[in-house]
């Protein structure tokens, strides 16, 4: 959570004093579960603050609130995508992906790990699934009007699909 506190307000002066706020603006980061802050001394641009928060929270936001090109991707599963596009049997790699995704069951990445499994499954039935699905999602994104959660979901899915396609073509579009 990010909060702005008016340290001059009567009901906030005690908090400001407790936190050692003596000049403004003062930015402090409170790690989850901690009451001890870390002072922020980086740049004050939106890009600097977003970069700092991404590092602390493990997120992939860009200035403006969107997601970057690796949001949703999972390194362990990307290596399996590379193995598949390098010539390994889809059945073999899909089984490995299913096992790797199961290992992430309790992890926040589970939703997108399951999406990798789905893409492998669909590719076993249709070689051009990734390209078709990427085109479909790109069209939906271009139309706009999506709820923020759907925008994030579709952006993450397109990032994953691009991993399948960039490896197949041997180049990155990032």
What feature does the model see in each segment?
Residues 1-174:
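Proteins that catalyze or organize thiol-disulfide redox chemistry
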